[in-house]
Amino acid sequence: MRKIMPYIILILSLISIIALYYGYKYRNHYTPAIPSIKAVKLSDNVVEVKYEIEEFKKDKDMYCLKKLATEQIEEDDVWTKAQNNKCSFIIDDNIYNFYLKNNYNTIIKINEASYLGNITNLSVDKEKVYLAINGTHTPTLTISSVGYADKTVKWISNNDSIASVDSNGKIKGLKNGNTKVIAKVMDKEISIDVVVTNLITLRPKKFNNKKKYLSCNIYSKEDNDLLDEILKDRINTVGYKTRAGVVEAARFLALEFPYKIRYFSENGRMGERKYKVDGEGRYYHEGLYLHSSRYKNIKYVSQGPKTWGCTMYNRVAHKRSANGLDCSGFITWVLVNGGFDPGDIGAGVSPGIKDLTDYGEKTIFNAKVVSSGKVKVGDLLSSTGPGGGHIAIIVGEDDDYYYVAESLWTSPNVGVVILPYSKKNLFKRYYYVMLMDSYYKEDGKLTKLWY
């Protein structure tokens, strides 16, 4: 008996171990499955949660739910059945909480998933900016994100001796040159090309009538090209083929261009004339007329071609003077650069001849019209008397004044200027106002003032 006792004990031990094993297996087989989270990751806009469940669980079904972080779990929430031990959640820029539950209503909050987030895209309102020295621009940065993303922006200038940038993204031009300003958010970045140039000046609140007249041949082709780029950028920013685009062209030439354009009585024009002349007291083309490379645009000549600031014979004054713009030459230049095609025409009120006063709603100007609120920045003005003869454009307005851009021939305001006129007596100088809504169609990003 003693000899077989060890074998009996061994057999009983094995039976006990087997019984414990199957007892454990049986107990785990029928008790609720509790998942063990193995991996949580975010790819693009999908949060993926992987989990494991003990091998012997009979009921391994699990269900997934996302809820806004501000919301509580409700009885009528719709849970999605997990597949292959994985839950996938599509998210957006809201903050969510994520949950798993089994068939026994045991709910587990997946805390790691709630703190995932990334930046999906960065965009700016302008990818290239042009600044005068000491000029500033604050870009509008749009951040697209999903989940719990850190939207802290780090601004960097590649050359802070040319242009600096502060923590709020305000860019300041310091000296001539080109550089990039970069906005970094998490793992994404976007760059803005910055051109700083002394070819333009800061726009003063009041027109500087003391600035020098443009001289002949002071600009290179590259200068002219860059100024044309800046002009186009200014117009596109507020809206090409809009009221604002036309106003911006006038503001640029009078305020941002550093020289005053002289008045030059036209030697002729291309519209409504048998004897056609192009670019002599006018320039019915996009861009500025500063370099001889622009001669290729000129279709007809009388005494030219000569760029603005260069002298040639004036057939009206019977003397040589610097080329520039007469009143209708200025207004047609403004219109064509703003995106419109009125034709290279004049300013009078002439039956049977197309004039600038034929555009828009020609209205006799008086105090009633002023008080009606119908007059807007961008409307044209005609003087003197019912026969016309002079044309101008309103480029600014405040409570008391209209600010009028025009090319004048009388001292002390000879050339392209902006002058303030009281709303109480402006109509004493201008007989007609052309209300231009029907012509422009759209206002664009119109502002009453330029500052």
List the predicted regions and their residue ranges.
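...with weaker cross-activation on analogous glycine-rich loops/strands in unrelated enzymes
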Residues: 340-414
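Extracytoplasmic soluble-region selector
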Residues: 116-202
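N-terminal capping segments
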Residues: 203-328, 332-338
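N-terminal Sec-pathway targeting helices
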Residues: 1-13
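Low-complexity, Gly/Ser/Thr/Pro-rich intrinsically disordered linker/tail segments
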Residues: 419-451
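Beta-strand-rich modules
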Residues: 95-106
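Surface-exposed, short loops/turns at beta-strand junctions within beta-sandwich domains
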Residues: 88-95, 172-177
